[in-house]
């Protein structure tokens, strides 16, 4: 690296890659995605790594309340709270065998973002 400013020199390339992957998430189309909470990113990463998971399992694994899980998945779906547009990264639908259970699945846009993040972190794609 030829940067002459030592405060800007990368000292850990793995963490720098992680920062770029998170920045890819924050650079979504919605203006308010810049201020996205870590819980929402964690929820997205859980769904990306457990596609077709149920919401209760996600909440249990991430130690979220049902209300937090709903807020996070609303933010990631097409419709955010109070009529605001969501990020459109996941869809929620009812389980056919248990109507009380919600299933979470990546949209094409969500798969594309997950692939971008994997490419940044590992140089690989395809979800």
For each feature predicted by the language model, list its residue ranges.
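Residues in the recognition helix of alpha-helical DNA-binding motifs
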Residues: 72
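Basic, amphipathic "hinge/linker" alpha-helix immediately C-terminal to the N-terminal HTH DNA-binding motif
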Residues: 96-114
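N-terminal leader segment of winged-helix/HTH proteins
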Residues: 1-38
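A short, conserved structural fragment
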Residues: 77-94
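Amphipathic alpha-helical dimerization/coiled-coil segments
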Residues: 5-6, 24-28, 111-127
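Extended hydrophobic secondary-structure segments that form protein cores and membrane-embedded regions
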Residues: 44, 90-94, 105
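N-terminal helix-turn-helix DNA-binding core of bacterial DNA-binding proteins
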Residues: 27-65
């Amino acid at each position: 690296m030829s940067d002459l400013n030592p405060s800007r020199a990368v000292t850990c390339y793995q963490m720098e890659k992680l920062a770029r992957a998170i920045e890819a998430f924050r650079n979504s189309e919605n203006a308010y995605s810049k201020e996205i909470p870590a819980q929402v990113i964690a929820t997205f990463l859980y769904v990306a790594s457990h596609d077709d998971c149920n919401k209760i399992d996600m909440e249990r694994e991430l130690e979220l309340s049902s209300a937090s899980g709903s807020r996070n998945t609303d933010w990631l779906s097409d419709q955010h709270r109070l009529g605001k547009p969501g990020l459109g990264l996941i869809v929620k639908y009812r389980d056919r065998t248990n109507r009380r259970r919600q299933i979470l699945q990546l949209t094409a846009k969500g798969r594309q973002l997950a692939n971008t993040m994997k490419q940044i972190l590992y140089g690989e794609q395809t979800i």
